[in-house]
Amino acid sequence: MSEAPSDEIEDLARQVIDAMLTPKRRVRPRIAEAFRDAEDMEVETPDGPVMSWRLGKGPATLLVHGWEDDNCLWGPIADKCYQLGRAVVAMDLPGHGFSKSELTSPDVAARAIAAVAAAQGPIDSIVGHSFGCIASMQAMSLGLAVPRVAFIAPPIPRMSDRWQRAADKGVPDDVIARAQAIYAAEYADRATSFDPEAAAEDMKAMALFVHSLDDESCPASNSQDLKRAWPGAKIILTDELGHRLVAQDSATLDRIIDFVEGFGG
């Protein structure tokens, strides 16, 4: 237990929550070379405007990056899709890149994904990475319908893990307890954590999970667990690509695009 005054505990507790909901931004937002000549669109969402880019006409693959990342993750797959004549839509999630809002969470990101899909459609598939996978799943559980999804290096987030990470960083127990109380009172719509494994059981889209066995951020068992829960899902396990490079590896992207195009099952 800390011996900090109650006002200090309150301030520290709110700092813990802010750190959970506020991604660290780059000093200057950036755009992938592939999207420099793309059609850009600022899309209004219930939580503020987000930036998006469409490259190509017709049914498109929506590309959803992860936590503290941005549209630049998708330069390699956008180039490949462009060469094949497949349209893509990229976005910067709330709190990221060119999007103006500061806070984000899976539910905020899910609403943004749904809004971009509606504004930049038609969307016939989603490729997500890390946090973007879970936000996309939540958007789908709320009604966003797409025939195919490919999820790369998904996490399986739990609120208990977030509080444990705070404890591991040395945050005192009474500060964490106060942060939990504030979170439950002021963020009631987020207090019940979205359960990806339970949601996967009811999904209708064809799904492909992709994971590198040496992922330093999210264990490959996450994809294996989600694949088992998701009816008819497929999985690609690779190695030596870590958490982010797996979303840019040429051979892996070829297999993802084959799946999105309907050639991979």
Model-assigned labels for residue ranges:
Residues 1-44:
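An N-terminal hydrophobic leader/cap segment in hydrolases
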Residues 71, 78-100:
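Conserved alpha/beta-hydrolase
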Residues 103-124:
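Alpha/beta-hydrolase active-site loop
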Residues 127-136:
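Gly/Ala-rich beta-loop-alpha elbow adjacent to hydrolase catalytic centers
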Residues 144-189:
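Hydrolase active-site cap/lid region
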Residues 202-204, 209-211, 215:
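Short beta-strand/loop motif that positions the catalytic acidic residue
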Residues 216-222:
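Conserved alpha/beta-hydrolase "acid-adjacent" motif
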Residues 241-253:
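Catalytic histidine-centered segment of alpha/beta-hydrolase-like enzymes
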